[in-house]
Design a protein with these regions (language model features):
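Terminal low-complexity tails and localization/encapsulation signals of metabolic enzymes
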Residues: 1-50, 54-57, 61-76, 87, ...
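Extended, amphipathic, non-transmembrane alpha-helical segments
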Residues: 79-85
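Hydrophobic packing residues within well-ordered alpha-helices of enzyme cores
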Residues: 111, 185-188, 215, 236-237
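Conserved small-residue-rich beta-alpha loop and adjacent elements
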Residues: 124-199, 269
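A structured beta-alpha segment of the ubiquitous adenosine-cofactor-binding alpha/beta core
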Residues: 135-137, 203-225
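Structural signal for hydrophobic
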Residues: 146, 170, 202, 221-224, ...
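Short beta->alpha connector loops at strand-helix junctions that form conserved
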Residues: 176-178, 206, 263-264
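ALDH superfamily catalytic-core signature
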Residues: 194-197, 217-219, 223, 230-285
C-alpha cells in the first residue's frame, strides 16, 4: 500500500492562485512518481512571514514547559508513523532501509533533545551574581521568525532539527525543504501541527531556490539556519548583511565531497566494503 501511495507537498497556507506543480520521482527510478510539489508563490512567502511574525510573541510567552510538551507530542507521532517515514525516505530520498531507520531515530532524538532544552533554559529565570547584594535574573526569549533551509541527503533529521531548536527557544519558523525531498518534510510538518504546534508557528514553504532567496532576504527574518553548500551559505551571509533591519543570526552547516585515501596496509575487502558504503549509504553521500 505505501509503495503506491501518492504524497503531496504544498505551502501551509496555500492560496487559490495557480502555481507550478512539480513531480517528485524516485531518484533510482525517474519513471516512478512518488508525489507532487506545489511551489510557494512570492506573495504566499510574504504572507507566511507575516503570519509567523504575528504569532511569535504569543508562542514565546507560552513558556519552555508547554513548548516542550508539544515537541514531545510531535516525537511520539513521528514514532507512530514509522512506516510512512521509512517508506518515504526510501522512495523519495533513495535511502537504504538502515539509513531510513537511523534518519527517523535522529529526527525523534532532535525533538526530544530540544524539548529538554526548552525546559532547562526557557522555563525559569537564571539567577546571576549580585555583586552589591542585588538580585539579578536572566530570562531567555525567542528572537522572532527563523528561516530554516535543509538539504536532500538528510530530508527528515536535518529538516526537523533546526526548526525544533528554533521552536523550543520561542521562535517561529518558515521552513524550505530541498526541492528534491519536500514530501518527507510535508509529513513532518503535518504531524507537528497534529501534535498541537500552531500552523502559523511552523510553516512549510516548498519550492526552488527563489523561495530560499526570499526567506533569507526579508528584513523581518530574525535568523537563518541553513545546511548545504558553502557557496550558498556565503551568498546568504551577504544577503543578510546588505539588508535593512536588525542584524540577523546565521547558523550555517556546510561542507563538500571528501576523498578516500587507501594505503598499502589496507585490506582489499575492507576497501571494497567502504567504497560501496560511501557510494550508496546516506543517499549516495
Amino acid at each position: 500500500e505505501l509503495e503506491n501511495k501518492h504524497w503531496v507537498a504544498e505551502p501551509t497556507f496555500k492560496s487559490g492562485s495557480e502555481a507550478e506543480i512539480a513531480p517528485i520521482n524516485k531518484p533510482h527510478d525517474l519513471t516512478a512518481e512518488v508525489g507532487t510539489r506545489r511551489d510557494t508563490l512570492d506573495f504566499e512567502v510574504e504572507e507566511a512571514i507575516t503570519r509567523a511574525q504575528a504569532i511569535q510573541p504569543g508562542w514565546d510567552r507560552l513558556g519552555g514547559e508547554k513548548r516542550a510538551v508539544l515537541l514531545e507530542a510531535a516525537a511520539d507521532l513521528f514514532e507512530e508513523h514509522t512506516d510512512d517515514f521509512l517508506s518515504l525516505c526510501q522512495r523519495e530520498a533513495g535511502k537504504t532501509l538502515m539509513d531510513a531507520v537511523l534518519e527517523l531515530r535522529e529526527a525523534v532524538d532532535f525533538l526530544r533533545f530540544y524539548a529538554n532544552e526548552a525546559r532547562r533554559q526557557f522555563t525559569r529565570p537564571i539567577i546571576l551574581p549580585g555583586p552589591t547584594g542585588e538580585e539579578n535574573r536572566l530570562s531567555l526569549h525567542g528572537r522572532g521568525v527563523f528561516s530554516c533551509i535543509s538539504p536532500w541527503n538528510f530530508p527528515l533529521a536535518i529538516f526537523i532539527g533546526t526548526p525544533a531548536a528554533a521552536l523550543a527557544a520561542g521562535n517561529t519558523v518558515v521552513a524550505k525543504p530541498a526541492e528534491q525531498t519536500p514530501l518527507i518534510a510535508a509529513l513532518a510538518v503535518r504531524l507537528c501541527h497534529e501534535a498541537g504546534i500552531p500552523e502559523e508557528a511552523f510553516q512549510l514553504l516548498p519550492g526552488a531556490g527563489e523561495v530560499g532567496e526570499m526567506i533569507t532576504s526579508d528584513p523581518r527574518i530574525a535568523g537563518v539556519a541553513f545546511t548545504g553548500s558553502t557557496q550558498t551559505a556565503q551568498a546568504i551571509n551577504r544577503s543578510l548583511a546588505s539588508r535593512d533591519g536588525p542584524i540577523a543570526t546565521l547558523i550555517a552547516e556546510t561542507g563538500g565531497q571528501n576523498a578516500m585515501i587507501v594505503d598499502s596496509t589496507a585490506l582489499p575487502e575492507q576497501v571494497v566494503r567502504d567504497v560501496m558504503r560511501s557510494a550508496f549509504a546516506s543517499a549516495g553521500q
